[in-house]
Amino acid sequence: MISKYCRLSSPRSDLIIKTHPHAEIIWWGSALKHFSPDDCASLERPVANGRLDIDTPLTLIAENALGLFSSPGLEGHRNGLDASPVFYTVDVEHTENTLRLTSEDSVAGLRLVSELVMTPSGILKVRHALTNLREGDWQINRFAITLPVAERAEEVMAFHGRWTREFQPHRVRLTHDAFVLENRRGRTSHEHFPALIVGTPGFSEQQGEVWAVHLGWSGNHRMRCEAKTDGRRYVQAEALWMPGEKALRKNETLYTPWLYACHSADGLNGMSQQYHRFLRDEIIRFPEQKLRPVHLNTWEGIYFNHNPDYIMQMAERAAALGVERFIIDDGWFKGRNDDRAALGDWYTDEQKYPNGLMPVINHVKSLGMEFGIWVEPEMINPDSDLFRLHPDWILSMPGYSQPTGRYQYVLNLNIPEAFDYIYKRFLWLLGEHPVDYVKWDMNRELVQAGHEGRAAADAQTRQFYRLLDLLRERFPHVEFESCASGGGRIDFEVLKRTHRFWASDNNDALERCTIQRGMSYFFPPEVMGAHIGHRRCHATFRQHSIAFRGLTALFGHMGLELDPVAADAKESDGYRRYALLYKEWRQLIHTGVLWRVDMPDSSIQVQGVVSPDQSQALFMISQLAMPDYTLPGILRFPGLAAEVRYRLRVIDHPEIQLVGEGGHTMRRLPAWMNQPLEASGEWLAKGGIQLPVLDPESAILIALERAV
């Protein structure tokens, strides 16, 4: 007999599912200590007058044929027929942390399998699979995962952005109707990171109850949350398909991307900590699990101006600054003198590198550094030998003129010959050169993405996965970075195949404070590429001190992006200092528990990391703009052990001069900045410390260590 109720549990949350006649989540929230299936009777709904005379369940597939009248989880037809499916549960497989529900519609000839996995970290993984059981193609228009949230979830947090300004949070109230994000750009996108957070009104970093979902998919997507007229609320996530893009022949099966969901009763910090633990436990895999090395990327240092002798000088200076991985960016391959030509011609430029890449690689490695290189396999320039040979290899619709983007087209990886060509060129690059690291870029969105006359954006994304999977299998020691004009392809599915994200093409430290904070809601610091750029940022033309740039890059995977040969002595000393500081603290930053701290003054941003055993912590206070108040207020440290006494010390701070010494912000420093301070974790969490008055666009770094 099929069990009517099933439970999936983690230490922090519980999920209760009614399995039949239809699969429906009836509880998703904080862990239940005294649950009995008999308790579920209390949640049986009344049937309101003036509507249908039956109860309408909000199922995992959200079926309008049951009278839901909401955004359906499945839309499709068989030549106009079988367009209103209703699924009845026929089998349930339940283990401690996994539930597999099989449902069928015998009239429409469809089978739905829903997989739910509750991970130890508290992340709920959900995926659907649809199989066509009958003759005749079943055309799929939409296929979404639907999860209910509590009626008290009245506020939505989502992320918007653009090139050089990713992960910008915004909020809306969810009282009636729906909030929808759609991405049709063919990659995860800068504009709409595929995630939604809904919660109790005013939820914050440290307060409130939230439910979050992230769709692990690197292509087009739709995210939706809705407040129904009956008061129920739900979130929905799906890959978004163009007309005619998906159809199932008899016995064919289509899977949705995995949805990663989370409940937190401890605000946004509790949510992030569960996502971070999940990624560290189940997805992030570094070769040999080594510490994240300090990078130097040549892009903003020399752009396309490649000279092997000069690059070797850059490598020497980089090594002297403490760099551990040296990456040659765009400009190394045949004819690549600017961004208008040569994509697709993946051969060493013999004019720039008459002796090939090996002299540079050998020199880099002789200096004790790893070697990395930039590629953009999915793109092709019209001005390239490859395009002149195969103009039909671009991703496009027949009969239409395809616009260029950044002077390039998208290479159609659905063409076997095009796929094989790219794969073989990278077998050459990685097989004949001791490359340790690949920065994989993708600098153009997809327009009229077609193959053989049919929409093919989804297929292109899957071919990208396939290509990367093959290269990872062939070269397991090579690490890959996901870059798409900065942060245009950041999601859990691509992270399964990569080791680092380039968070943004914007190295401005002030902008990075917001970008990196936004990214930290779902991703831990060790996969967040964060570089110290030039004193004058190439993206914004703002100028920042080396201290502000260095500390901002500290809470990620640190690197430099500049020309170390051209740097003056003061800048070089700063690069060396912050590379050394990063090495000292990276073990903590990349394994500890991340905390973002609520501050009453929005011009002050605070984040920190506490070690798993709570013996040490590192907190950064960034003054983003002029403070709202004369005094910046009190910082109360979360995450510490109440009974432990901690010694507080300042690790780094801007040059502070008091009034009378040439300064202008303070006549007297807080006492703890002049004399050693020891206090209990309880006092530091409840009493806290009075912050100093800082100039805009500066930061201070504080360490807390268990007192002996």
Swiss-Prot record:
GO terms for biological process: carbohydrate catabolic process. It is an enzyme of class 3 (hydrolase). Belongs to the glycosyl hydrolase 36 family. It holds the Pfam family Glyco_hydro_36N. This is Alpha-galactosidase. Its EC number is 3.2.1.22. One of its GO terms (molecular function) is alpha-galactosidase activity. The keyword Cytoplasm does not apply. InterPro entries: Aldolase_TIM, Alpga-gal_N_sf, Alpha-glycosidase_related, Glyco_hydro_27/36_CS, Glyco_hydro_36, Glyco_hydro_36_N, Glycoside_hydrolase_SF. Keywords: Glycosidase, Hydrolase, Plasmid. The active site is at residues 441, 505. Homotetramer. The keyword rRNA processing does not apply. It catalyses: Hydrolysis of terminal, non-reducing alpha-D-galactose residues in alpha-D-galactosides, including galactose oligosaccharides, galactomannans and galactolipids.
